[in-house]
Amino acid sequence: QARTTIHEIEKLWPEVDLLHSNHGSLAYRRAFKAGLPRAYMRGYNEVLEVGPGWKWHNELTIRLPDGNDVHFHHGKSANIMTVGQKQGTCYVQGHYHTKYGISYWGNPSSLLWAMQVGCLIDKDSLAFAYDKVFKDRPIIGCGIIINSQPKLLPMVLNKGGRWNKLCP
């Protein structure tokens, strides 16, 4: 089922820059620890059955229309503003499932920001079962950048924790 959905997404966006994550790389880390040579491992695109237009990065920096750079990483620290300030760029990350927000700071030449985008995980999936022991629940949502400015798009959930089909 996941591949069917991914194929639909690939039709919409045949060229995508994606970030490696601790979830996606788990199989690779376990194989490496067990001593399997890298040559025996299939790449993400082969596993997902997507074309070469999907490119994977550990981290990525792009120039925004306003001239500022924005740095993307799966997750370096729960304090996004500190990471952005140390990078000297705007900054976007995921990883911290219970964090969701935008922080701003200024310097003599510009207004910069950092955005924590939450996650899009199915809280009931086996892959996320480890989270049941934590008191904080995941925040389901994503972020976008329009005209060099960050915007958060939370997934509006009903009382049962399912998407109510509304977009903010």
Where are these regions (language model features)?
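Short acidic low-complexity segments
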Residues: 48-65, 76-79
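Conserved beta-strand segments of alpha/beta enzyme cores
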Residues: 15-17, 53-55, 71, 113
